[in-house]
From Swiss-Prot:
PTM sites of type Phosphoserine: S114, S170, S212, S630, S652, S654, S772
Modifications made to the protein after synthesis: Polyubiquitinated via 'Lys-11'-linked ubiquitin by the APC(CDH1) complex during late mitosis, leading to its degradation. Able to mediate auto-deubiquitination.
InterPro entries linked: Papain-like_cys_pep_sf (IPR038765), Peptidase_C19 (IPR050164), Peptidase_C19_UCH (IPR001394), UIM_dom (IPR003903), USP37-like_PH (IPR032069), USP37-like_PH_sf (IPR038093), USP_CS (IPR018200), USP_dom (IPR028889)
GO CC annotation terms, alphabetical: chromosome; cytosol; nucleus
Residue window of motif KEN box 1: 32-34
Biased composition range(s): Polar residues: 135-148, 172-195, 266-300
The protein's name: Ubiquitin carboxyl-terminal hydrolase 37
Keywords: Cell cycle, Cell division, Chromosome, Hydrolase, Mitosis, Nucleus, Phosphoprotein, Protease, Repeat, Thiol protease, Ubl conjugation, Ubl conjugation pathway
Annotated UIM domain residues: 706-725, 808-827, 830-849
Quaternary structure, from the entry: Interacts with FZR1/CDH1. Interacts with CDT1.
Gene that encodes it: USP37
Class of this enzyme: hydrolase
Enzyme Commission number(s) from the entry: 3.4.19.12
Organism: Canis lupus familiaris (Dog)
Length: 981
């Protein structure tokens, strides 16, 4: 059979995937092993979709669509809907005739019209008996498989192939099905040839009939396609009258259509008629249908008798041969999935700076992997923490709808605004400032997580005495973006070298001064300008010299190097920043070889990050060393496990530590006394008994202990006594989430004379019922606040006073809320006014300084910077490396954030990113996404490029190779699957 193929826009609707968008492609008919399938190809590529047609067509409709064009609509038995538009009418008509033939089991009569009726009858006679058996088995098994929820369009191909095996029981049904075939062959044989000619002669009339009856058929299908009711009608004799009534209604409708059209109509019951053979739609078809339904019950029962055993095997076979992209799982089609991935972020109101930075950060594959794939306990992180909002948006950005994504963007903005108020409104902001704030805040959140994450023993190492099971999570900012530069100050007089190290997340580099005779300079030149040696006034402690030379070298390289190009200069006259539109060449590769030494550390490998994702135990000696060498607030990083480790971690301020610890223990004892006081109130005993705690302190033997042992004992006692109270205080705070693991809020609210070590300890004690401590804590606090004398009032008066105070607090809270709402409205109004004024000012600046900004294109104004001087060989080598990246420590361009506009106070930010998975460049302009060539990025952003992301060449090649291997494996699996189909 020569395959039929038509081209045009395609749309598919199914229960699993929903309705796809119109996509250019083609429908192709393929016949294999007596099974007819429809293969859908898309012009954009991807794995084709295959739909079974044999015994699976429900309706075929052809409608005109323009001049000499038609739209073909195909409905399958599971209500899947396929449409192809703008098809030439002749091709569409041929396809419709073929689908009608497949629908009515006249495939070979339609495809071989040259054969006579006798020849066709012989072919049908040899094939129908097997098909009738397959139809009975397929119909019965479809009812069973529908209960397992596996009704998919493409499932019928291997399904019928297994059940159609003669060795699986077709011999048993040969007798029952043979009777039906003998009765139905004459009508089909006699009608085959004239039916073919009739279809060719009356195309227009049949199209009109199909259009008029299409809606009526669609209304009846849901009621008719009820597998449960039909199964009961066949297996339960007491329910036969339901089937007879349904068949009678269908037959009456068919007879009426025969009288009106005079042609063979589309039979809505052909799916169910398959179990009784092909029906004779003549004038006496009504009685014949009823006798067939009632007389076929025994054979149907026999076929159902052996179905339960092979049915599970057939389902298993089905899953193996199914398209690999989703076994029995609802999935998004390739076309719509690709469209979702190419969706940007909505502009919330002058938030283009945020959208551009987020798109660039999300495109860093190693950064995203370190954030999402190391098992960070997100429930231990506060809901309003930036790292949690950031990761949530990263996970959902390609799979959620636009409204959900917009809400996630607002949460990210609010998380940053909570720390940096300048981003709280809707004013225009600088993209580099937002990037710096975002990276710093992410690092702080990771530090808090590692600091407060409670220790857990590593499986199999509980008995190791020298191991403290502390989980350390990798900070994505540190492993991917942070690098270290060593500044060496060299005295010119005596040669004394003083090294100083500094960590950076990005480099802010100056524009090189461009003189007219020279060609445009590149980012490589600006980077080399940053690292060039410079002189400065410096007083040498050794010789007293006043002049020194400073050299800058990389001490540790990053995976991704972020370069911020300073495109703004301050205008003293206008007191404004002017944008410099100077042209700067954007090379594909940068090299840092001239700024590295033999001791320069390479970037963290991808394997290193993966290993850090596992729970890695640290030895106690390593923990002590980290405590001692920590440059900032070492006391907050302590994790005490034993007296020995405590003694090692003590510093010179141990006496102050001891005083603070004793004060903390006394306060905790008082809190415990308040709890005891509440218990005594319930027993009508008023005194608050804290004497036992004091006696315990006195009898603890502190006098004979050293300071170290005394501190350890006090801390241990405080931990034992205060764990329930501190646990309740954490739960009672309204700003903390139930799934929060951070204790930073508690640390900030503690008095200065308290040691924050204890609050940062993990909660190892089982927490009591919060309800049992609510009244205790409130009563205790209320007693302290109002200074209620013990025993001076009765319990009833005290509770009444407490209720009155609580009502007063509620009223004050309502007033505070109302006032805050008014202040918020006033603030929003002020922001709107500021936005209007800023817009007017930007327009004025644009009109007044347009010529000035054009003039700034000629020269950056950096008089003292001038230009880098290279030898001819060095210049040629750098030029070659810009395209090949052959020099050591080369970095590859992967993203550019550009500012479109002539002034710094107005304009728009966009982002160009390289997608490693798609191996292509895309431009993200808020919600709009478009594909772009790398050469266009380099040429179009040479005057507007603001922030540049470069990835280390070895890291880039490794990620690219991994992605290519993954895609090759997927294509191989898809090819094997298509061959099996």
């Amino acid at each position: 059979m020569s395959p039929l193929k038509i081209h045009g826009p395609i749309r598919i609707r199914s229960m699993q995937t929903g309705i796809t968008k119109w996509k250019e492609g083609s429908f192709e008919i393929v016949e294999k092993e007596n099974k007819v399938s429809l293969v859908v190809h898309y012009n954009t590529g991807g794995i084709p979709r295959i739909f079974q047609l044999s015994h699976n067509i429900k309706n075929v409709v052809l409608r005109p669509s323009g001049a000499k064009q038609s739209r073909l609509m195909l409905t399958l038995q599971d209500n899947s809907f396929l449409s192809i538009d703008k098809v030439p009418s002749k091709d569409a008509e041929e396809m419709r005739l073929f689908l009608d033939a497949v629908h009515q089991n006249r495939l070979h009569a339609a495809m071989k019209p040259s054969q006579g009726s006798g020849s066709f009858g012989a072919i049908l006679g040899s094939r129908t008996s097997q098909k009738e058996t397959n139809r009975q088995l397929s119909y019965s098994d479809n009812q069973a498989s529908s209960k397992r929820g596996s009704l998919e369009t493409k499932d019928d191909i291997p399904f019928r192939k297994v059940l159609g095996n003669p060795g699986r029981g077709s011999i048993k049904t040969a007798t029952g099905s043979g009777i039906t075939v003998t009765r139905t062959i004459p009508s089909l044989t006699s009608a085959s040839t004239p039916l073919r000619s009739g279809l060719l002669e009356n195309r227009t009339e049949k199209r009109k009939r199909m259009l008029s009856s299409g809606s009526e058929l669609n209304e009846d299908y849901p009621k008719e396609n009820d597998s449960s009711s039909n199964n009961k009608a066949m297996t339960d004799p007491s329910r036969k009258y339901l089937t007879s009534s349904r068949e009678k209604q269908l037959s009456l409708k068919q007879s009426e259509e025969n009288r009106t059209s005079g042609l063979l109509p589309l039979q809505s019951s052909s799916f169910y008629g398959s179990r009784t053979g092909s029906k004779d739609y003549s004038s006496g078809s009504t009685n014949l249908d009823r006798t067939n339904v009632s007389g076929q019950t025994p054979s149907a029962k026999r076929s159902l008798g052996f179905l339960p055993q092979p049915a599970p095997l057939s389902v298993k076979k089905l899953r193996c041969n199914q398209d690999y992209t989703g076994w029995n799982k609802p999935r998004v089609p390739l076309s719509s999935h690709q469209q979702q991935q190419l969706q940007g972020f909505s502009n919330l109101g002058n938030t283009c700076y945020m959208n551009a930075i987020l798109q660039s950060l999300f495109s860093l594959q190693s950064f995203a992997n370190d954030l999402l794939k190391q098992g960070i306990p997100w429930k231990k992180i506060p809901l309003n923490a930036l790292i949690r909002r950031f990761a949530h948006l990263l996970v959902k950005k390609d799979i959620c709808n636009s409204e959900t994504k917009k809400d996630l963007l607002k949460k990210v903005k609010n998380a940053i605004s909570a720390t940096a108020e300048r981003f709280s409104g809707y004013m225009q902001n600088d993209a580099h400032e937002f990037l710096s704030q975002c990276l710093d805040q992410l690092k702080e959140d990771m530090e808090k997580l590692n600091k407060t994450w409670k220790t857990e023993p590593v499986p199999g190492e509980e008995n190791s005495p020298d191991i403290s099971a502390t989980r350390v999570y990798t900070c994505p900012v540190i492993t991917n973006l942070e690098f270290e530069v060593q500044h060496s100050i060299i005295c010119k007089a005596c040669g004394e070298i003083i090294p100083k190290r500094e960590q950076f997340n990005d480099l802010s580099i100056d524009l090189p001064r461009r003189k007219k005779p020279l060609p445009p300079r590149s980012i490589q030149d600006s980077l080399d300008l940053f690292f060039r040696a410079e002189e400065l006034e410096y007083s040498c402690e050794k010789c007293g010299g006043k002049c020194a030379l400073v050299r800058h070298k990389f001490n540790r390289l990053p995976r991704i190097l972020i370069l911020h190009l300073k495109r703004y200069s301050f205008n003293v006259t206008l007191s404004l920043n002017n944008k410099i539109g100077q042209q700067v060449i954007i090379p594909r590769y940068l090299t840092l070889s001239s700024h590295c030494t033999e001791n320069t550390k390479p970037p963290f490998t991808l394997g290193w990050s993966a290993h850090m994702a596992i729970s890695r135990p640290l030895k106690a000696s390593q923990m002590v060393n980290s405590c001692i060498t920590s440059p900032s607030t070492p006391s907050k990083n302590f994790t005490f496990k034993s007296k020995s480790s405590l003694a090692l971690c003590l510093d010179s301020d141990s006496e102050d530590e001891l005083k603070r610890s004793v004060a903390l223990s006394q306060r905790l004892c008082e809190m415990s006394g308040c709890e005891q006081q509440q218990d005594d109130l319930e027993k009508d005993s008023k005194p608050c008994r804290i004497e036992p705690d004091k006696s315990e302190l006195e009898n603890s033997g502190f006098d004979g202990m050293s300071e170290e042992e005394l501190l350890a004992a006090v801390l241990e006692m405080s931990k034992r006594e205060a764990s329930p109270t501190l646990s309740h205080e954490d739960d009672d705070k309204p700003t903390s989430s139930p799934d929060t693991g951070f204790a930073e809020d508690d640390i900030q609210e503690m008095p200065e004379n308290q040691d924050p070590v204890e609050t940062e300890k993990p909660k190892t004690v089982t927490e009591p019922d919060p309800a049992s401590f609510t009244e205790i804590t409130k009563d205790c606090d209320e007693n302290k606040e109002n200074k209620t004398p013990e025993g001076s009032q009765g319990e009833v008066d005290w509770l009444q006073q407490y209720d009155m105070e609580r009502e007063r607090e509620e009223q004050e809270l309502q007033q505070a809320l109302a006032q805050s709402l008014q202040e918020q409205e006033a603030w929003e109004q002020k922001e709107d006014d500021d936005l209007k004024r800023a817009t007017e000012l930007s327009l004025q600046e644009f009109n007044n300084s347009f010529l000035d900004s054009l003039g700034s294109d000629e020269d950056s104004g950096n008089e003292d910077v001038l230009d880098m001087e290279y030898t001819e060989a060095e210049a040629e080598e750098l030029k070659r490396n810009a395209e090949t990246g052959n020099l050591p420590h080369s970095y590859r361009l992967i993203s550019v954030v550009s500012h479109i506009g002539s002034t710094s106070s107005s304009g728009h930010y966009i982002s160009d990113v390289y997608d490693i998975k798609k191996q292509a460049w895309f431009t993200y302009n808020d919600l709009e996404v478009s594909k772009i060539q790398e050469a266009s990025v380099q040429s179009d952003r040479d005057r507007s490029g603001y922030i540049f992301f470069y990835m280390h060449k070895e890291i880039f090649d490794e990620l690219l190779e991994t992605e290519k291997n993954s895609q090759a494996l997927s294509m191989e699996v898809g090819k094997t699957t298509r061959q099996a189909l």
